[in-house]
């Protein structure tokens, strides 16, 4: 059989005469022992038959036909290699940090050898507002390899695509995802496009969320740089109490200055986007840490007051502080 089938060699002497299914592309080698010409060989695959009897003959199975050796005849049913099939096998799930999980199922008559997922921007579904009004810069499709079983039968597989594309410019935008499966013969099968919103990281702090939105706009198009600089400058106009640390305010002002340069290029724009991403992460995680510490302190104060026999009024005040800290943390 062809190598793509992964099947062992088949011996004709072990097969009873009659119908015989053989993969297209299989090579047949006949070797006869004894007196040459004692058994007549006829088959439908060679363009010409030998003029003289020969103890060997070789040919390729390219379709239905027959092989006859003496009185024994095999009717060959050539089985074509089918293209692999692949499709989603469940709903997309996501985590707060932007990790996406999408199950898929693939199958092939001789086994799936590889696969990929291609993600493209679904521009007609994008809500064209604010920085997304202008046309986006062209970007190549996202292509990620699919996980495959290390061992065992790959004729039927179910796996899970796990990927984190939270930093990609298309995060939180409509995209179309297409699965592709490949078999050993190089044939490909594709799923219908799956329309999803590409998961991004959830930013809960208002300042971090505003910075990420402006980062998205400059990655959508470099022409958004002047507008983004103006908005970031307005956001940071009164930094008192807005930034958890002075270093964050200075980092944002440096990013604004870079965006306002007339010679801003793609490399510089991408550098600024990295600064904005890191800044938003620092603000988000820092605010969470502060809220958690305030919640811990409020809980400890309440517990200590109960141990010391505080009055109902004092306990009520501390309970209100604890609830407020819990709301801030949540």
Regions inferred by a protein language model and the residue ranges of each:
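Extracytoplasmic/secretory ectodomains and luminal regions
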Residues: 1-330
């Amino acid at each position: 059989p062809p190598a793509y089938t992964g099947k062992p060699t088949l011996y004709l002497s072990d097969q009873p005469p009659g119908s015989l299914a053989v993969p297209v592309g299989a090579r047949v080698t006949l070797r006869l022992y004894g007196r040459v010409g004692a058994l007549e060989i006829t088959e439908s695959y060679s363009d010409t038959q030998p003029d003289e009897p020969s103890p060997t003959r070789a040919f390729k199975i390219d379709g239905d036909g027959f092989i006859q050796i003496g009185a024994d005849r095999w009717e060959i049913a050539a089985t074509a290699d089918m293209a692999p099939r692949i499709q989603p096998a469940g709903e997309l799930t996501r985590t707060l940090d932007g990790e996406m999980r999408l199950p898929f199922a693939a199958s092939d008559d001789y086994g799936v050898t590889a696969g990929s997922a291609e993600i493209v921007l679904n521009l007609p579904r994008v809500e064209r507002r604010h920085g997304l009004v202008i046309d986006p810069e062209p970007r190549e499709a996202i292509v990620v390899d699919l996980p495959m079983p290390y061992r065992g039968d790959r004729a039927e597989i179910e796996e899970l695509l796990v990927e984190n594309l939270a930093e990609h410019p298309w995060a939180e935008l409509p995209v179309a995802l297409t699965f592709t499966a490949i078999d050993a013969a190089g044939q490909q099968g594709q799923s219908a496009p799956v329309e999803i919103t590409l998961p991004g990281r959830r930013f809960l702090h208002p300042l971090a969320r505003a910075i990420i939105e402006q980062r998205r706009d400059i990655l959508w198009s470099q022409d958004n740089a002047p507008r983004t600089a103006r908005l970031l400058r307005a956001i940071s106009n009164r930094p008192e109490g807005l930034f958890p640390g002075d270093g964050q305010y200075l980092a944002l002002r440096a990013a604004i200055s870079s965006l306002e340069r007339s010679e801003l290029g793609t490399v510089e724009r991408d550098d600024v986007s990295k600064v904005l991403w890191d800044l938003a992460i620092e603000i988000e995680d820092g605010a969470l840490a502060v809220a958690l510490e305030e919640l811990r302190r409020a809980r400890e104060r309440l517990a200590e007051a109960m141990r010391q026999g505080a009055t109902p009024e004092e306990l009520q005040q501390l309970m209100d502080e604890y609830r407020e800290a819990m709301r801030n943390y949540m």
